[in-house]
Amino acid sequence: MDKFQSYLGLDRSHYFLYPLIFQEYIYVLAHDHGLNGSVLLENAGYDNKSSLLIVKRLIIRMYQQNHLILSVNDSKQTPFLGHNKNFYSQVMSEVSSTIMEIPLSLRLISSLERKGVVKSDNLRSIHSIFSFLEDNFSHLNYVLDILIPYPAHMEILVQALRYWIKDASSLHLLRFFLHECHNWDSLITSNSKKAGSSFSKRNHRLFFFLYTSYVCEYESGFLFLRNQSSHLRSTSSGSLIERIYFYGKIEYLAEVFAGAFQANLWLFKDSFMHYVRYQGKSILASKGTFILMNKWKYYFVNFWKSYFYLWSQPGRIYINQLSNHSLDFLGYRSSVRLKPSMVRGQMLENTFLIDNAIKKFDSIVPIMPLVGSLAKSKFCNALGHPIGKAVWADLSDSDIIERFGRIYRNLSHYHSGSSKKKSLYRVKYILRLSCARTLARKHKSTVRAFLKRFGSRLLEEFFTEEEQVFSLTFPRVSSISRRLSRRRIWYLDIVCINDLANHE
């Protein structure tokens, strides 16, 4: 961020970001931050040097002529510097999204410094959500499963940025990219799975940036109403640019909501309410009654309709009772279960037993969706029978073993919060045998022969970090090591969901 500050000179430029698109170092920064896996280097037949040459030629052409003004009706294969225009539109859209993120990231850092937050990495962790649920959900009664609607028009997303980015030229350039992107209409859907798949295609960073800005707008309004209707101040543990303006827009929102909701605030007073968002969905849990949750449900519908021109069906927001409902998200199945316990009491000379049920938060890994993810990645068939990874057969033996071992260690690390580890044992079996079949296919041998040859080595590769730590800490007490390895462990260094664990 120090480099960003020196490059931008924000105090002097007043957030005029448009000229930065003509600077070569911005393209380098976009590449270094891993935008879309680096579209410059993913293009077939280009290395680092030729990619930089493409950037230089692109900037020179933009200086000489206005090549940004291209007719939407032109052919997709219209040559532009020897390539089709979609390729360069994609490159420039990614760079533009990087440019617009820079001042927001700088503001986030200054905001954290003002609040005295020294390190925010733990707040970004996915596992911090589950540790939060473990501490709070056992005391709640109802939960709202909310499917966040998507804007019907991209202009709504652009307008959400007007309060963040003051450079009109950058916003006009953003509109140009949205019209150029041929898959932009795939976002016009209320199906989060379809919208999520569109993010993984072209212009991932740009659409994700626009979507998070829209979500920030809607959540800032919800946060304002939440703070006004509760005696307790809510604290935000969101991540990255989604947290930047939660508090900065309160002053503006006060004018908007004062007349519309002030008379109805008493309907929503609830001191025990928690909100979690993930992958285009959100959860609103409360200790209140069913009537209160139903009021919140229709508040969301009317709020989206009035201020974002979004039509959302009330049927897309489900009210469930936590005692008999499971939450499937982020690769876990979470629920609140009643754990029976018996207490022996004594009064004078009489003893009696008291049945007592305690609410306990539980999280497990659903095995069938996980096996389905492995089947899509060609590690096994639909029934869970391991198959060889044919595309890896050209790699060396050590690379094949290392890849399979790393996949399992990552999955085991991500699912360490599961209370039941049996599903991970099945994943370990599938990946281990798939590795053996891949090696056997490469050397035209049998699986049995390779298991005899590499048996101990294959087993070592599939040891997780936790198992190694426990075995080193308690080398002589195997029972303690096994008992500790079965407990739920939440890691605060996981900031992105594993692709195989993502069943949404």
UniProtKB/Swiss-Prot annotation:
Usually encoded in the trnK tRNA gene intron. Probably assists in splicing its own and other chloroplast group II introns. GO terms for molecular function: RNA binding. Belongs to the intron maturase 2 family. MatK subfamily. Keywords: Chloroplast, mRNA processing, Plastid, RNA-binding, tRNA processing. HAMAP family: MatK (MF_01390). The keyword Plastid applies. One of its GO terms (biological process) is RNA splicing. It comes from the Eukaryota. This is Maturase K. GO terms for cellular component: chloroplast. It is found in: Plastid, Chloroplast. InterPro entries: Domain_X (IPR024937), Maturase_MatK (IPR002866), Maturase_MatK_N (IPR024942).
